[in-house]
Amino acid sequence: MKNFTSFADAGDYKALLQQALEIKSNPYGYQHIGRNKTVGLIFFNPSLRTRLSSVKAAYNLGAQAWVLNAGADSWTLEMADGAVMNGGTQEHIKDAIAVMSQYCDVLGVRTFPTLKDKAEDYGEVVFNKILQYATVPVISLESATLHPLQSFADLITVAETKQKERVKVVLTWAPHVRALPQCVPNSFCDWFSEIDWVDFVITHPEGYELDPKFTKGARIEYDQKKALEGADYVQAKNWSSYRDYGQVLQNDPAWMLTPEHMALTDSAKFLHCLPVRRNVEVSDAVLDAPGSLIIQEAGNRTISMQTVLHELLK
């Protein structure tokens, strides 16, 4: 593993998953891997789980970690190549990332889409510049299109709780008060459509189809109730339209996940990446039910990051 930005970087996912489960069973047993190593973490947008779990993961491996909030804690960064920097920006991303690479052994970066320019967002312009200028391995802490550490944590959660060899996993769209990016659902599809013991179904209103390159191999069902029938795991998440980029085409509250929806499943466990708008995306009754795995899932964010750091630092 040279960098970690998508499912493709996981390589043999079964081996990586087994490593994660071993690390979870003995989280402090690999501190020789991180001894005298430093993990750099750069955030271009707010974070709770990613920030804290990444720091914890580094410490668990015996490494140190530093955190930088781009812009707030640093000079304002210029992204454009060949820019004449006579305006508000004070340091070029080319110089900043090269310098940060001097201060760490692996660099975690969190960027975010504008939801205004599909070509720019899906071209991963900012993240690719960081990959270009970094001289150490780079981990995606979320990018404009993907959130691989979250999806890896989801996979760990399903793997450690499943009660049968094959499971049906459903990703359902949910309403929200604002337009959200497609990073989490894209990544969930990127991972779960490739898992050979998962029957993967995506359900959403028409017009909310995700980028087909991430949904290949999945069954798409526009009838939410039909999709939920017999499910073993349900992941709820809002996203804005990919086709009509960044737009909220409709926000039907009937898509909010309730106990009535969950009753259609095979006593399914519930997943959500958090943060969640309670009683907008998902009802309290689902979030607080015994079958809700949201806290265990969040805890596994440490394990997913720790496993990736283990691979990159060993």
Residue ranges and their predicted role:
Residues 1-52, 56:
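Positively charged, low-complexity intrinsically disordered leader regions
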Residues 32-40, 47-159, 277:
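Phosphate/diphosphate ligand-binding glycine-rich loop within oxidoreductases
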Residues 33-39, 166-168, 267:
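Phosphate-coordination loops involved in phosphoryl transfer and adenosine-cofactor binding
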Residues 288-314:
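C-terminal helix-to-coil terminal segments
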Residues 213-292:
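Rossmann-like adenosine-cofactor binding region
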Residues 134-136, 197-198, 263-269:
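A short helix->loop->beta-strand "cap" motif at the edges of active sites that frequently abuts
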Residues 44-66, 159-237:
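Glycine-rich phosphate/diphosphate-binding loop of Rossmann-like nucleotide-binding domains
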